[in-house]
Protein backbone atom coordinates (compact mmCIF):
# COMPACT_ATOMS: atom_id res chain seq x y z
CA UNK A 1 0.00 0.00 0.00
CA UNK A 2 1.48 3.35 -1.05
CA UNK A 3 1.05 6.70 0.68
CA UNK A 4 -1.87 7.81 -1.48
CA UNK A 5 -3.74 4.55 -0.82
CA UNK A 6 -3.34 5.06 2.91
CA UNK A 7 -4.55 8.64 2.69
CA UNK A 8 -7.53 7.62 0.57
CA UNK A 9 -8.44 4.93 3.09
CA UNK A 10 -8.27 7.37 6.01
CA UNK A 11 -10.40 9.94 4.23
CA UNK A 12 -12.96 7.43 2.96
CA UNK A 13 -13.45 6.03 6.47
CA UNK A 14 -13.63 9.49 8.09
CA UNK A 15 -10.66 8.58 10.29
CA UNK A 16 -9.31 12.17 10.57
CA UNK A 17 -12.70 13.33 11.82
CA UNK A 18 -12.78 10.46 14.33
CA UNK A 19 -9.26 11.19 15.60
CA UNK A 20 -10.01 14.89 15.91
CA UNK A 21 -13.14 14.18 17.94
CA UNK A 22 -11.27 11.76 20.22
CA UNK A 23 -8.41 14.23 20.75
CA UNK A 24 -10.82 17.05 21.54
CA UNK A 25 -12.57 14.83 24.06
CA UNK A 26 -9.27 13.86 25.70
CA UNK A 27 -8.05 17.45 25.93
CA UNK A 28 -11.30 18.75 27.41
CA UNK A 29 -12.12 15.84 29.73
CA UNK A 30 -8.56 15.00 30.87
CA UNK A 31 -9.61 11.52 32.09
CA UNK A 32 -7.55 9.69 34.71
CA UNK A 33 -7.65 6.54 32.56
CA UNK A 34 -7.36 7.62 28.89
CA UNK A 35 -7.52 4.03 27.62
CA UNK A 36 -10.85 3.38 29.31
CA UNK A 37 -12.09 6.78 28.12
CA UNK A 38 -11.18 5.99 24.50
CA UNK A 39 -12.84 2.58 24.72
CA UNK A 40 -16.03 4.26 25.94
CA UNK A 41 -15.87 6.81 23.13
CA UNK A 42 -15.36 4.15 20.46
CA UNK A 43 -18.34 2.23 21.81
CA UNK A 44 -20.42 5.40 21.44
CA UNK A 45 -19.21 5.75 17.85
CA UNK A 46 -20.62 2.30 17.11
CA UNK A 47 -23.89 3.21 18.77
CA UNK A 48 -24.12 6.42 16.73
CA UNK A 49 -23.72 4.46 13.49
CA UNK A 50 -20.07 4.83 12.48
CA UNK A 51 -17.31 7.39 12.00
CA UNK A 52 -19.34 9.49 9.58
CA UNK A 53 -21.75 10.32 12.42
CA UNK A 54 -18.99 11.77 14.59
CA UNK A 55 -18.46 15.52 14.86
CA UNK A 56 -15.56 17.48 16.27
CA UNK A 57 -17.42 18.05 19.57
CA UNK A 58 -19.10 14.66 19.98
CA UNK A 59 -17.05 13.87 23.07
CA UNK A 60 -16.84 17.41 24.44
CA UNK A 61 -19.18 17.97 27.38
CA UNK A 62 -21.72 20.76 26.96
CA UNK A 63 -20.13 23.18 29.41
CA UNK A 64 -16.75 22.95 27.67
CA UNK A 65 -17.82 23.71 24.10
CA UNK A 66 -16.99 27.41 24.30
CA UNK A 67 -13.20 26.88 24.20
CA UNK A 68 -11.49 28.90 21.43
CA UNK A 69 -9.98 26.95 18.50
CA UNK A 70 -6.33 25.92 18.82
CA UNK A 71 -3.83 28.11 16.92
CA UNK A 72 -6.54 30.29 15.50
CA UNK A 73 -8.29 27.33 13.94
CA UNK A 74 -5.32 26.39 11.72
CA UNK A 75 -4.35 23.11 13.38
CA UNK A 76 -7.36 21.32 11.97
CA UNK A 77 -6.66 22.33 8.39
CA UNK A 78 -3.00 21.34 8.60
CA UNK A 79 -3.96 17.98 10.06
CA UNK A 80 -6.37 17.31 7.20
CA UNK A 81 -3.81 18.45 4.57
CA UNK A 82 -1.30 15.89 5.81
CA UNK A 83 -3.63 12.91 5.55
CA UNK A 84 -5.82 13.77 2.54
CA UNK A 85 -4.91 12.34 -0.90
CA UNK A 86 -3.12 14.64 -3.32
CA UNK A 87 -5.57 13.80 -6.12
CA UNK A 88 -7.69 16.96 -6.48
CA UNK A 89 -10.55 14.96 -8.00
CA UNK A 90 -11.03 12.85 -4.86
CA UNK A 91 -14.51 13.61 -3.45
CA UNK A 92 -13.83 14.44 0.16
CA UNK A 93 -15.63 16.84 2.48
CA UNK A 94 -13.82 19.97 3.62
CA UNK A 95 -14.39 21.42 7.08
CA UNK A 96 -12.54 24.69 6.88
CA UNK A 97 -15.60 26.26 8.48
CA UNK A 98 -17.86 24.51 10.94
CA UNK A 99 -21.40 23.93 9.70
CA UNK A 100 -24.09 26.16 11.23
CA UNK A 101 -25.82 24.97 14.39
CA UNK A 102 -29.30 23.84 13.49
CA UNK A 103 -32.20 25.29 15.45
CA UNK A 104 -34.54 22.55 16.54
CA UNK A 105 -38.23 23.26 16.76
CA UNK A 106 -39.74 22.82 20.23
CA UNK A 107 -43.31 21.60 20.21
CA UNK A 108 -45.75 21.39 23.06
CA UNK A 109 -49.39 20.72 23.83
CA UNK A 110 -50.09 24.44 23.53
CA UNK A 111 -48.52 24.52 20.04
CA UNK A 112 -45.65 26.68 21.29
CA UNK A 113 -42.94 26.80 18.63
CA UNK A 114 -39.69 28.56 19.47
CA UNK A 115 -35.99 27.85 19.01
CA UNK A 116 -33.78 26.60 21.80
CA UNK A 117 -31.87 29.86 21.67
CA UNK A 118 -34.98 31.94 22.27
CA UNK A 119 -36.05 29.68 25.12
CA UNK A 120 -32.74 30.36 26.85
CA UNK A 121 -33.43 34.10 26.80
CA UNK A 122 -36.87 33.85 28.37
CA UNK A 123 -37.54 34.74 31.97
CA UNK A 124 -39.12 31.52 33.19
CA UNK A 125 -41.01 33.19 36.03
CA UNK A 126 -42.79 36.54 35.98
CA UNK A 127 -40.57 38.87 38.07
CA UNK A 128 -43.63 40.89 39.14
CA UNK A 129 -45.22 37.88 40.86
CA UNK A 130 -44.09 35.63 43.72
CA UNK A 131 -42.02 32.75 42.40
CA UNK A 132 -43.53 29.29 42.97
CA UNK A 133 -41.80 27.06 45.48
CA UNK A 134 -39.54 24.56 43.75
CA UNK A 135 -38.84 21.09 45.16
CA UNK A 136 -36.35 18.85 43.37
CA UNK A 137 -36.62 15.11 44.05
CA UNK A 138 -33.46 13.13 43.27
CA UNK A 139 -32.27 9.59 43.87
CA UNK A 140 -31.14 6.47 42.11
CA UNK A 141 -33.21 4.77 39.41
CA UNK A 142 -35.90 2.80 41.22
CA UNK A 143 -35.64 4.77 44.48
CA UNK A 144 -39.28 5.86 44.27
CA UNK A 145 -38.82 9.43 43.02
CA UNK A 146 -41.96 9.39 40.91
CA UNK A 147 -44.16 7.94 43.63
CA UNK A 148 -42.98 10.37 46.29
CA UNK A 149 -43.06 13.35 43.93
CA UNK A 150 -46.70 12.67 43.10
CA UNK A 151 -47.55 12.36 46.79
CA UNK A 152 -45.84 15.68 47.56
CA UNK A 153 -47.63 17.40 44.70
CA UNK A 154 -51.00 16.04 45.81
CA UNK A 155 -50.53 16.94 49.48
CA UNK A 156 -49.47 20.53 48.89
CA UNK A 157 -51.41 21.27 45.71
CA UNK A 158 -48.22 21.62 43.65
CA UNK A 159 -47.66 20.85 39.98
CA UNK A 160 -45.74 17.64 39.23
CA UNK A 161 -43.12 17.45 36.48
CA UNK A 162 -41.33 14.22 35.58
CA UNK A 163 -38.23 15.07 33.56
CA UNK A 164 -37.92 11.50 32.33
CA UNK A 165 -41.52 11.53 31.14
CA UNK A 166 -40.99 14.89 29.40
CA UNK A 167 -38.10 13.42 27.42
CA UNK A 168 -39.91 10.16 26.63
CA UNK A 169 -42.95 12.04 25.31
CA UNK A 170 -40.73 14.28 23.21
CA UNK A 171 -38.91 11.28 21.76
CA UNK A 172 -42.22 9.61 20.91
CA UNK A 173 -43.69 12.72 19.24
CA UNK A 174 -40.50 13.58 17.35
CA UNK A 175 -39.34 10.09 16.40
CA UNK A 176 -38.46 11.18 12.84
CA UNK A 177 -36.27 14.02 14.11
CA UNK A 178 -32.56 13.11 13.93
CA UNK A 179 -31.70 14.93 17.12
CA UNK A 180 -34.34 13.14 19.16
CA UNK A 181 -33.51 9.81 17.55
CA UNK A 182 -29.97 10.19 18.87
CA UNK A 183 -31.26 11.20 22.30
CA UNK A 184 -33.48 8.11 22.30
CA UNK A 185 -30.41 5.93 21.70
CA UNK A 186 -28.51 7.69 24.47
CA UNK A 187 -31.30 7.20 27.00
CA UNK A 188 -31.92 3.59 25.95
CA UNK A 189 -28.24 2.89 26.64
CA UNK A 190 -28.54 4.29 30.15
CA UNK A 191 -26.67 7.55 29.54
CA UNK A 192 -27.80 11.03 30.55
CA UNK A 193 -29.71 13.09 28.00
CA UNK A 194 -27.88 16.22 26.80
CA UNK A 195 -27.91 18.85 29.51
CA UNK A 196 -29.07 21.86 27.51
CA UNK A 197 -31.81 19.89 25.79
CA UNK A 198 -33.14 18.74 29.14
CA UNK A 199 -33.01 22.23 30.64
CA UNK A 200 -34.82 23.61 27.61
CA UNK A 201 -37.63 21.08 27.98
CA UNK A 202 -37.99 21.89 31.67
CA UNK A 203 -38.10 25.64 30.98
CA UNK A 204 -40.71 25.18 28.29
CA UNK A 205 -42.88 23.15 30.66
CA UNK A 206 -42.49 25.71 33.45
CA UNK A 207 -43.56 28.51 31.13
CA UNK A 208 -46.79 26.63 30.44
CA UNK A 209 -47.77 26.67 34.14
CA UNK A 210 -47.12 30.26 35.30
CA UNK A 211 -49.84 30.31 37.97
CA UNK A 212 -48.71 27.38 40.11
CA UNK A 213 -47.90 28.00 43.78
CA UNK A 214 -45.36 25.21 43.84
CA UNK A 215 -43.70 22.72 41.50
CA UNK A 216 -42.21 19.30 42.22
CA UNK A 217 -39.57 18.22 39.68
CA UNK A 218 -38.75 14.52 39.62
CA UNK A 219 -35.42 13.20 38.35
CA UNK A 220 -33.42 16.38 37.91
CA UNK A 221 -30.60 17.29 38.27
CA UNK A 222 -28.49 14.16 37.78
CA UNK A 223 -25.09 15.80 38.33
CA UNK A 224 -23.54 19.04 39.56
CA UNK A 225 -23.29 20.51 36.05
CA UNK A 226 -27.06 20.15 35.63
CA UNK A 227 -27.62 21.69 39.06
CA UNK A 228 -25.52 24.71 38.12
CA UNK A 229 -27.35 25.06 34.80
CA UNK A 230 -30.73 24.85 36.56
CA UNK A 231 -29.77 27.60 39.00
CA UNK A 232 -28.31 29.76 36.25
CA UNK A 233 -31.20 29.47 33.80
CA UNK A 234 -34.19 28.87 36.09
CA UNK A 235 -33.75 29.44 39.84
CA UNK A 236 -32.30 28.08 43.06
CA UNK A 237 -34.63 25.37 44.40
CA UNK A 238 -36.31 25.83 47.77
CA UNK A 239 -35.74 22.22 48.80
CA UNK A 240 -33.99 19.15 47.43
CA UNK A 241 -35.31 15.74 48.53
CA UNK A 242 -32.76 12.92 48.19
CA UNK A 243 -34.04 9.33 48.37
CA UNK A 244 -31.23 7.02 49.48
CA UNK A 245 -31.69 3.34 48.75
CA UNK A 246 -29.43 0.26 48.79
CA UNK A 247 -27.95 -0.64 45.41
CA UNK A 248 -29.37 -4.17 45.47
CA UNK A 249 -32.84 -2.86 46.26
CA UNK A 250 -32.62 -0.45 43.30
CA UNK A 251 -31.76 -3.36 40.99
CA UNK A 252 -34.68 -5.42 42.29
CA UNK A 253 -37.14 -2.56 41.83
CA UNK A 254 -35.90 -1.79 38.32
CA UNK A 255 -36.21 -5.43 37.31
CA UNK A 256 -39.77 -5.55 38.62
CA UNK A 257 -40.64 -2.28 36.87
CA UNK A 258 -39.20 -3.55 33.60
CA UNK A 259 -41.46 -6.60 33.79
CA UNK A 260 -44.54 -4.49 34.57
CA UNK A 261 -44.04 -1.37 32.43
CA UNK A 262 -41.54 -2.31 29.72
CA UNK A 263 -39.75 1.05 29.74
CA UNK A 264 -36.94 1.06 27.14
CA UNK A 265 -34.41 2.44 29.64
CA UNK A 266 -35.10 -0.41 32.09
CA UNK A 267 -33.27 -3.01 30.00
CA UNK A 268 -30.42 -4.82 31.78
CA UNK A 269 -27.58 -3.00 30.04
CA UNK A 270 -29.17 0.41 30.53
CA UNK A 271 -29.98 -0.36 34.17
CA UNK A 272 -26.37 -1.22 34.93
CA UNK A 273 -25.14 1.91 33.19
CA UNK A 274 -27.68 4.14 34.96
CA UNK A 275 -26.63 2.76 38.34
CA UNK A 276 -22.97 3.41 37.50
CA UNK A 277 -23.78 6.97 36.45
CA UNK A 278 -25.78 7.51 39.61
CA UNK A 279 -23.00 6.21 41.83
CA UNK A 280 -20.46 8.48 40.14
CA UNK A 281 -22.59 11.61 40.23
CA UNK A 282 -24.67 11.32 43.40
CA UNK A 283 -22.02 12.00 46.05
CA UNK A 284 -20.78 15.34 44.63
CA UNK A 285 -24.36 16.36 43.79
CA UNK A 286 -25.60 15.71 47.33
CA UNK A 287 -22.58 17.47 48.80
CA UNK A 288 -23.15 20.48 46.52
CA UNK A 289 -26.73 20.95 47.71
CA UNK A 290 -25.74 20.23 51.29
CA UNK A 291 -23.18 23.04 51.26
CA UNK A 292 -26.01 25.33 50.16
CA UNK A 293 -28.26 24.05 52.97
CA UNK A 294 -30.96 22.87 50.56
CA UNK A 295 -31.01 19.07 50.83
CA UNK A 296 -32.68 16.58 53.15
CA UNK A 297 -31.88 12.86 52.82
CA UNK A 298 -34.35 10.04 53.45
CA UNK A 299 -34.02 6.28 53.79
CA UNK A 300 -36.10 5.11 50.81
CA UNK A 301 -35.53 1.43 51.52
CA UNK A 302 -38.86 1.28 53.37
CA UNK A 303 -42.61 1.37 52.93
CA UNK A 304 -43.56 4.31 50.70
CA UNK A 305 -46.05 5.72 53.23
CA UNK A 306 -43.39 5.81 55.95
CA UNK A 307 -41.01 7.59 53.59
CA UNK A 308 -43.68 10.10 52.61
CA UNK A 309 -44.53 10.85 56.25
CA UNK A 310 -40.92 11.84 56.86
CA UNK A 311 -40.79 13.91 53.67
CA UNK A 312 -43.96 15.76 54.73
CA UNK A 313 -42.38 16.64 58.08
CA UNK A 314 -39.32 18.04 56.31
CA UNK A 315 -41.36 20.00 53.74
CA UNK A 316 -43.51 21.51 56.49
CA UNK A 317 -40.38 22.49 58.40
CA UNK A 318 -38.47 23.95 55.45
CA UNK A 319 -41.20 25.59 53.37
CA UNK A 320 -43.94 26.34 55.90
CA UNK A 321 -42.07 27.18 59.14
CA UNK A 322 -44.70 29.62 60.41
CA UNK A 323 -47.37 27.03 61.09
CA UNK A 324 -48.73 27.38 64.61
CA UNK A 325 -47.07 24.93 67.01
CA UNK A 326 -49.49 22.85 69.10
CA UNK A 327 -47.22 23.05 72.15
CA UNK A 328 -44.55 25.30 73.50
CA UNK A 329 -41.12 23.76 73.12
CA UNK A 330 -40.39 24.16 76.80
CA UNK A 331 -43.14 21.63 77.57
CA UNK A 332 -41.58 18.93 75.44
CA UNK A 333 -39.53 16.04 76.74
CA UNK A 334 -37.01 15.05 74.03
CA UNK A 335 -36.90 11.44 75.21
CA UNK A 336 -40.65 11.11 74.55
CA UNK A 337 -40.65 12.67 71.09
CA UNK A 338 -40.01 9.55 69.01
CA UNK A 339 -42.46 8.60 66.30
CA UNK A 340 -42.33 4.82 66.19
CA UNK A 341 -41.96 3.22 62.83
CA UNK A 342 -41.37 6.47 60.98
CA UNK A 343 -37.81 6.63 59.78
CA UNK A 344 -35.96 9.53 58.28
CA UNK A 345 -32.32 9.95 57.38
CA UNK A 346 -31.79 13.68 57.52
CA UNK A 347 -28.21 13.31 56.51
CA UNK A 348 -25.15 14.30 58.47
CA UNK A 349 -22.63 17.05 58.36
CA UNK A 350 -20.50 15.75 55.51
CA UNK A 351 -18.12 18.68 55.38
CA UNK A 352 -15.32 16.59 56.89
CA UNK A 353 -15.95 13.48 54.82
CA UNK A 354 -14.62 12.40 51.46
CA UNK A 355 -17.09 12.13 48.62
CA UNK A 356 -16.69 8.38 48.41
CA UNK A 357 -17.80 8.04 52.02
CA UNK A 358 -21.13 9.73 51.42
CA UNK A 359 -24.03 7.40 52.11
CA UNK A 360 -25.79 7.87 48.77
CA UNK A 361 -27.24 4.38 48.53
CA UNK A 362 -28.53 4.03 52.08
CA UNK A 363 -25.81 1.44 52.66
CA UNK A 364 -23.54 1.47 55.70
CA UNK A 365 -20.63 3.76 54.91
CA UNK A 366 -18.82 2.46 57.98
CA UNK A 367 -18.08 -0.71 55.99
CA UNK A 368 -16.48 -3.32 58.21
CA UNK A 369 -17.58 -1.47 61.33
CA UNK A 370 -21.15 -2.64 60.78
CA UNK A 371 -20.06 -6.27 60.71
CA UNK A 372 -18.21 -5.77 64.01
CA UNK A 373 -21.24 -3.99 65.42
CA UNK A 374 -23.50 -6.94 64.69
CA UNK A 375 -21.12 -9.20 66.63
CA UNK A 376 -21.25 -7.03 69.77
CA UNK A 377 -23.37 -7.86 72.80
CA UNK A 378 -26.47 -5.68 72.71
CA UNK A 379 -28.90 -5.34 75.62
CA UNK A 380 -32.10 -3.30 75.65
CA UNK A 381 -33.14 -2.10 79.10
CA UNK A 382 -36.82 -1.15 79.17
CA UNK A 383 -38.75 0.53 81.93
CA UNK A 384 -41.03 3.45 82.57
CA UNK A 385 -39.86 6.88 83.74
CA UNK A 386 -38.83 6.51 87.38
CA UNK A 387 -38.17 2.77 87.18
CA UNK A 388 -34.47 3.35 87.81
CA UNK A 389 -33.10 2.58 84.34
CA UNK A 390 -30.46 5.29 84.41
CA UNK A 391 -29.08 4.32 87.83
CA UNK A 392 -28.90 0.63 86.98
CA UNK A 393 -27.35 1.22 83.57
CA UNK A 394 -24.45 3.13 85.12
CA UNK A 395 -23.74 0.27 87.55
CA UNK A 396 -24.08 -2.42 84.89
CA UNK A 397 -21.84 -0.55 82.46
CA UNK A 398 -19.14 -0.32 85.12
CA UNK A 399 -19.40 -4.00 86.10
CA UNK A 400 -19.46 -5.52 82.61
CA UNK A 401 -17.52 -2.94 80.59
CA UNK A 402 -20.57 -2.05 78.53
CA UNK A 403 -21.23 1.29 76.86
CA UNK A 404 -24.42 2.88 78.17
CA UNK A 405 -26.46 4.69 75.53
CA UNK A 406 -29.61 6.63 76.39
CA UNK A 407 -31.75 7.59 73.42
CA UNK A 408 -33.10 10.61 75.26
CA UNK A 409 -29.60 11.81 76.10
CA UNK A 410 -28.39 11.28 72.54
CA UNK A 411 -31.25 13.39 71.26
CA UNK A 412 -30.55 16.16 73.78
CA UNK A 413 -26.88 16.18 72.79
CA UNK A 414 -27.81 16.45 69.13
CA UNK A 415 -30.00 19.46 69.88
CA UNK A 416 -26.95 21.31 71.22
CA UNK A 417 -25.12 20.94 67.91
CA UNK A 418 -25.47 23.17 64.86
CA UNK A 419 -26.00 20.42 62.30
CA UNK A 420 -28.81 20.40 59.74
CA UNK A 421 -30.23 17.40 61.55
CA UNK A 422 -30.43 19.27 64.86
CA UNK A 423 -32.20 22.19 63.18
CA UNK A 424 -34.80 19.83 61.72
CA UNK A 425 -35.31 18.11 65.09
CA UNK A 426 -35.72 21.45 66.84
CA UNK A 427 -38.27 22.63 64.27
CA UNK A 428 -40.26 19.42 64.65
CA UNK A 429 -40.30 19.58 68.44
CA UNK A 430 -41.24 23.25 68.53
CA UNK A 431 -44.31 22.40 66.47
CA UNK A 432 -45.16 19.62 68.91
CA UNK A 433 -44.74 16.90 66.29
CA UNK A 434 -43.05 13.55 66.90
CA UNK A 435 -39.41 13.18 65.96
CA UNK A 436 -39.17 10.36 63.40
CA UNK A 437 -37.54 7.32 64.95
CA UNK A 438 -35.10 7.05 62.05
CA UNK A 439 -33.32 10.06 63.53
CA UNK A 440 -32.93 8.23 66.82
CA UNK A 441 -31.78 5.05 65.09
CA UNK A 442 -29.15 6.99 63.17
CA UNK A 443 -27.93 8.63 66.39
CA UNK A 444 -27.73 5.22 68.04
CA UNK A 445 -25.78 3.71 65.17
CA UNK A 446 -23.32 6.60 65.09
CA UNK A 447 -22.74 6.37 68.85
CA UNK A 448 -22.27 2.59 68.69
CA UNK A 449 -19.81 2.74 65.80
CA UNK A 450 -17.84 5.45 67.64
CA UNK A 451 -17.44 3.14 70.67
CA UNK A 452 -16.33 0.02 68.80
CA UNK A 453 -12.98 -1.26 69.98
CA UNK A 454 -13.41 0.32 73.41
CA UNK A 455 -16.38 -1.64 74.69
CA UNK A 456 -17.52 -5.17 75.51
CA UNK A 457 -21.10 -4.45 74.52
CA UNK A 458 -23.92 -1.92 74.50
CA UNK A 459 -26.56 -1.28 77.11
CA UNK A 460 -29.31 0.76 75.45
CA UNK A 461 -31.75 2.55 77.73
CA UNK A 462 -35.17 3.73 76.59
CA UNK A 463 -35.30 1.94 73.25
CA UNK A 464 -37.34 0.65 71.48
CA UNK A 465 -40.53 2.46 72.44
CA UNK A 466 -42.70 0.56 69.96
CA UNK A 467 -42.49 -2.66 67.98
CA UNK A 468 -41.64 -1.05 64.66
CA UNK A 469 -38.59 0.59 66.21
CA UNK A 470 -37.35 -2.81 67.37
CA UNK A 471 -37.98 -4.34 63.96
CA UNK A 472 -36.07 -1.56 62.23
CA UNK A 473 -33.17 -1.83 64.68
CA UNK A 474 -32.98 -5.56 63.97
CA UNK A 475 -33.01 -5.03 60.22
CA UNK A 476 -30.43 -2.26 60.08
CA UNK A 477 -28.13 -3.17 62.98
CA UNK A 478 -29.10 -6.53 64.48
CA UNK A 479 -31.39 -8.09 67.07
CA UNK A 480 -30.46 -7.56 70.73
CA UNK A 481 -29.09 -10.55 72.62
CA UNK A 482 -31.19 -9.70 75.67
CA UNK A 483 -34.14 -7.43 76.47
CA UNK A 484 -34.70 -6.61 80.14
CA UNK A 485 -37.99 -5.11 81.31
CA UNK A 486 -37.87 -3.37 84.69
CA UNK A 487 -41.32 -4.08 86.08
CA UNK A 488 -42.48 -1.27 88.37
CA UNK A 489 -45.92 -0.02 89.42
CA UNK A 490 -47.27 3.36 88.37
CA UNK A 491 -47.49 4.50 92.01
CA UNK A 492 -43.83 3.73 92.68
CA UNK A 493 -42.66 5.46 89.52
CA UNK A 494 -44.86 8.50 90.26
CA UNK A 495 -43.49 8.84 93.81
CA UNK A 496 -39.90 8.59 92.59
CA UNK A 497 -40.46 11.17 89.86
CA UNK A 498 -42.23 13.57 92.22
CA UNK A 499 -39.27 13.42 94.60
CA UNK A 500 -36.95 14.11 91.69
CA UNK A 501 -39.09 17.02 90.45
CA UNK A 502 -39.15 18.62 93.92
CA UNK A 503 -35.38 18.54 94.12
CA UNK A 504 -35.21 20.23 90.74
CA UNK A 505 -37.94 22.77 91.70
CA UNK A 506 -40.29 21.81 88.86
CA UNK A 507 -43.44 21.71 91.06
CA UNK A 508 -46.81 21.19 89.37
CA UNK A 509 -45.28 21.25 85.89
CA UNK A 510 -43.35 18.15 86.88
CA UNK A 511 -46.52 16.39 88.04
CA UNK A 512 -48.31 17.10 84.75
CA UNK A 513 -45.36 15.89 82.77
CA UNK A 514 -45.12 12.72 84.89
CA UNK A 515 -48.74 11.72 84.27
CA UNK A 516 -48.37 12.27 80.55
CA UNK A 517 -45.13 10.30 80.31
CA UNK A 518 -46.43 7.35 82.33
CA UNK A 519 -49.55 7.15 80.20
CA UNK A 520 -47.49 7.18 77.02
CA UNK A 521 -45.13 4.52 78.35
CA UNK A 522 -47.84 2.09 79.41
CA UNK A 523 -49.68 2.52 76.12
CA UNK A 524 -46.58 1.73 74.07
CA UNK A 525 -44.73 -0.82 76.21
CA UNK A 526 -47.24 -3.70 76.23
CA UNK A 527 -46.87 -4.61 72.50
CA UNK A 528 -43.08 -4.28 72.76
CA UNK A 529 -42.92 -6.63 75.74
CA UNK A 530 -45.15 -9.13 73.93
CA UNK A 531 -43.00 -8.89 70.79
CA UNK A 532 -39.77 -9.77 72.59
CA UNK A 533 -41.46 -12.43 74.74
CA UNK A 534 -42.36 -14.26 71.55
CA UNK A 535 -38.75 -13.99 70.39
CA UNK A 536 -37.64 -15.48 73.79
CA UNK A 537 -35.28 -12.56 74.36
CA UNK A 538 -37.14 -10.95 77.27
CA UNK A 539 -36.32 -11.11 80.99
CA UNK A 540 -38.53 -9.32 83.54
CA UNK A 541 -36.96 -7.86 86.68
CA UNK A 542 -38.87 -6.61 89.73
CA UNK A 543 -37.84 -2.95 90.07
CA UNK A 544 -39.85 -2.21 93.25
CA UNK A 545 -36.96 -3.03 95.60
CA UNK A 546 -33.85 -1.13 96.60
CA UNK A 547 -31.25 -0.28 93.95
CA UNK A 548 -28.99 -3.03 95.33
CA UNK A 549 -31.73 -5.67 95.13
CA UNK A 550 -32.65 -4.68 91.59
CA UNK A 551 -28.98 -4.68 90.54
CA UNK A 552 -28.51 -8.27 91.71
CA UNK A 553 -31.52 -9.39 89.67
CA UNK A 554 -30.16 -7.62 86.60
CA UNK A 555 -26.76 -9.26 86.97
CA UNK A 556 -28.41 -12.67 87.25
CA UNK A 557 -30.35 -12.05 84.03
CA UNK A 558 -27.23 -10.95 82.14
CA UNK A 559 -25.06 -13.78 83.46
CA UNK A 560 -27.66 -16.32 82.33
CA UNK A 561 -27.22 -15.19 78.72
CA UNK A 562 -23.52 -14.32 78.45
Swiss-Prot record:
Record: residues binding AMP 1: 168, 191-193, 219-222, 226, 263, 274
Location relative to the cell: Cytoplasm
A Pfam family hit: ADK
Highest taxon of source: Eukaryota
Gene3D superfamilies in alphabetical order: P-loop containing nucleotide triphosphate hydrolases (3.40.50.300)
Region called LID 2, residue ranges: 499-509
Keywords, sorted A to Z: ATP-binding, Cytoplasm, Kinase, Nucleotide-binding, Transferase
GO molecular function: adenylate kinase activity; ATP binding; nucleoside diphosphate kinase activity
GO BP, one annotated term: ATP metabolic process
UniProt region (LID 1), positions on chain: 256-266
EC category: transferase
Binding residues for AMP 2: 407, 412, 433-435, 462-465, 469, 506, 517
Family listed: Belongs to the adenylate kinase family.
PANTHER family associated with the record: NUCLEOTIDE KINASE (PTHR23359)
Oligomer status and interactors: Monomer. Interacts with YWHAZ.
Protein name: Adenylate kinase isoenzyme 5
Lineage, top ranks: Eukaryota, Metazoa, Chordata, Craniata, Vertebrata
Amino acid sequence: MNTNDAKEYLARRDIPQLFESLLNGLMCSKPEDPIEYLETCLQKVKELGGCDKVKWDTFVSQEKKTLPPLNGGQSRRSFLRNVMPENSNFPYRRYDRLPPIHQFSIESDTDLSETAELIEEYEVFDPTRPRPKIILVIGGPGSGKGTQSLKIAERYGFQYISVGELLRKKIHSASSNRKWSLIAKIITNGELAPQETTITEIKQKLMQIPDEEGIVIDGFPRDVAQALSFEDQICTPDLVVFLACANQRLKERLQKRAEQQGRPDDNLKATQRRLVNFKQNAAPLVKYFQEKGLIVTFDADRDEDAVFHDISVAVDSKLFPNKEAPMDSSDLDPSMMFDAGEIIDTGSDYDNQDDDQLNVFGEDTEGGFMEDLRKCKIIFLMGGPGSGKGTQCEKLAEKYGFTHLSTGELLRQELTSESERSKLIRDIMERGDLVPSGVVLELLKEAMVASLGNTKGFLIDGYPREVKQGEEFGRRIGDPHLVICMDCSADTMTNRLLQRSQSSQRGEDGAKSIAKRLEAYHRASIPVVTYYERKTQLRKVNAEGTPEQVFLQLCTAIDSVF
